[in-house]
């Protein structure tokens, strides 16, 4: 007897009347006149398959006691369903109970509405819900599409280090990595902590970005990307921030900001097309329960050409909009989410690439423009969320990079390896960063980024 996934069984590609076996968990059960109708899911798709068991089965009394969350193996004949909303069902010849739910009354995942706040408290069980099953499959689809896009376009995937000595953003919000005894810290003659006695012989941290490391490979392999976990010790309790998240960071050699923007547009549209093509069932559920525009917004995004606007012009538009914003709009201040959303939703009505930001609000590695006041930076703004991608052309001139590092108070000797790229065959190059969880939030229409990752890490929250 063939073991098949629920997705395969429902797809209509198996012979009707053939014997199949499915393995999964009970979503719901209802009984009627000697019959038990068991909705079984295995996570392969959104829809469950109905297993129909009758009272001729020797363990029918046991089957009737099944509750949501119990695991089973069902064997039987695959037939067209007589009920509405389902294509096929299984007429069971056997149902073996593999695992019972200890106490159905206290089982946290009940077949009823549950708030996201409650589900975060049981994050180890929430993938069993319809919502988090859908989010997880979409997250997987996006991750697979990321690698596929870059592979098809000639990029090499680079595994950048998680433990580092460098602050790629220059913000200082990093998690320290140490094996020193926190109760009896070794001290040097000045009384400072003696990190030479630590595991790596120096101060080390969890990475905030793989960009600096991946640039090294860009300047040898031309087109590269990294896709991995990053960490920010930012004491932020908003719905938009995580302490641990995943970043996608491509880097292209012999490229300027315009080429960087084109890559970002092609990349996002490829990802959204993949989700529409591969996860229509999950998007349909999200459109019904979470975000009614879940499908329409992705289609609109794909079909709309990106608008490009200079930061200076964006500030003027915002100042002349007549709209009262919570945060001030002045040249030299970073744009806030409310400003970004006004530009992309109310004024332009499609994705926007804002370019050439004031140099003092952007990172030290961004290329200084000829005006000496701005850098070749970009933010891609999407309707409904604001910034979704941040990128720049990198500073390839050693003297300018050194001046920028001095301006930011960074020790150039500490970044000597990064400066080497500008000493040996330097070329113009560019790249961007896309927070993977922010992408999942946008696609799924979630209101809190903590629901876009399996086990959220945030200030005061590191369970599981």
Swiss-Prot record:
- A Pfam family cross-referenced in the UniProt record is tRNA-synt_2
Q: Which InterPro entries match?
A: Aa-tRNA-synt_II, aa-tRNA-synth_II, aa-tRNA-synth_II/BPL/LPL, Asn-tRNA-ligase, Asp/Asn-tRNA-synth_IIb, NA-bd_OB-fold, NA-bd_OB_tRNA
Which reactions does this protein catalyse?
tRNA(Asn) + L-asparagine + ATP = L-asparaginyl-tRNA(Asn) + AMP + diphosphate + H(+)
Supply one GO molecular-function term: ATP binding
Q: Where in the cell is it found?
A: Cytoplasm
Q: What is its main location?
A: cytoplasm
Which SUPFAM superfamilies does the record associate with it?
Class II aaRS and biotin synthetases (SSF55681), Nucleic acid-binding proteins (SSF50249)
Q: Does the keyword Hydrolase apply?
A: no
One GO-annotated biological process of the protein: asparaginyl-tRNA aminoacylation
Q: Which UniProt keywords apply?
A: Aminoacyl-tRNA synthetase, ATP-binding, Cytoplasm, Ligase, Nucleotide-binding, Protein biosynthesis
Name a GO CC annotation attached to this entry: cytoplasm
Per UniProt, the enzyme's principal EC class comes to: ligase
Q: State the EC number(s).
A: 6.1.1.22
Q: What does the annotation say about its assembly with partners?
A: Homodimer.
What family is this protein classified in? Belongs to the class-II aminoacyl-tRNA synthetase family.
- According to UniProt, the name of this protein is Asparagine--tRNA ligase
């Amino acid at each position: 007897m063939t073991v098949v996934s629920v997705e395969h069984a429902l797809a209509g590609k198996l012979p009707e009347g053939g014997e199949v076996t499915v393995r999964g968990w009970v979503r719901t059960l209802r009984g009627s006149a000697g019959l038990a109708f068991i909705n079984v899911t295995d996570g392969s798709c959104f829809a469950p398959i109905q297993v129909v068991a009758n009272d001729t089965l020797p363990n029918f009394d046991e089957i009737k006691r099944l509750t949501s969350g119990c695991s089973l193996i069902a064997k039987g004949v695959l037939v067209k369903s007589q009920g509405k909303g389902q294509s096929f069902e299984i007429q069971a010849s056997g149902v073996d109970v593999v695992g019972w739910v200890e106490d159905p009354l206290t089982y946290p995942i009940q077949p009823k509405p549950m708030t996201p706040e409650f589900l975060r408290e049981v994050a180890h069980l929430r993938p069993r819900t319809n919502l988090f099953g859908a989010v997880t499959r979409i997250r997987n689809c996006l991750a697979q599409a990321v690698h596929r896009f870059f592979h098809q376009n000639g990029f090499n995937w680079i595994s950048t280090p998680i433990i580092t000595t460098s602050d790629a953003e220059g913000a200082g919000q990093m998690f320290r990595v140490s094996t020193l005894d926190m109760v009896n810290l070794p001290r040097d003659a000045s009384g400072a902590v003696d990190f030479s006695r630590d595991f790596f012989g120096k101060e080390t941290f969890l990475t905030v970005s793989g960009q600096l490391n991946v640039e090294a490979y860009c300047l040898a392999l031309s087109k590269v990307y990294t896709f991995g976990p990053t960490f920010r010790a930012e004491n932020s309790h908003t719905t938009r921030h995580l302490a641990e998240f995943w970043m996608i960071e491509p880097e292209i050699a012999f490229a300027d900001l315009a080429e960087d923007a084109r890559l970002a547009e092609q990349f996002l549209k490829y990802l959204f097309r993949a989700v529409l093509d591969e996860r229509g069932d999950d998007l349909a559920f999200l459109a019904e329960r979470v975000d009614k525009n879940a499908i329409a917004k992705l289609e609109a995004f794909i079909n709309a050409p990106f608008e490009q606007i200079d930061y200076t012009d964006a500030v003027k538009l915002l100042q002349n909009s007549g709209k009262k914003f919570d945060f001030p709009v002045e040249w030299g201040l970073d744009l806030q989410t409310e400003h970004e959303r006004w530009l992309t939703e109310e004024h332009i009505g499609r994705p926007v690439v804002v370019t050439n930001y004031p140099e003092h609000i952007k990172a030290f590695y961004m290329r200084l423009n000829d005006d000496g006041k701005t850098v070749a930076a970009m933010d891609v703004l999407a309707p409904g969320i604001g910034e979704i991608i941040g990128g720049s052309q990198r500073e390839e001139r050693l003297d300018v990079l050194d001046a920028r590092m001095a301006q930011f108070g960074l020790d150039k000797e500490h970044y000597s390896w990064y400066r080497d790229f500008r000493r040996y065959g330097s070329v113009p190059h560019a790249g961007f960063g896309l927070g993977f969880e922010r992408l999942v939030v946008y696609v799924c229409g979630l209101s809190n980024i903590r629901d876009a990752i399996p086990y959220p890490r945030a200030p005061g929250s590191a369970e599981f």
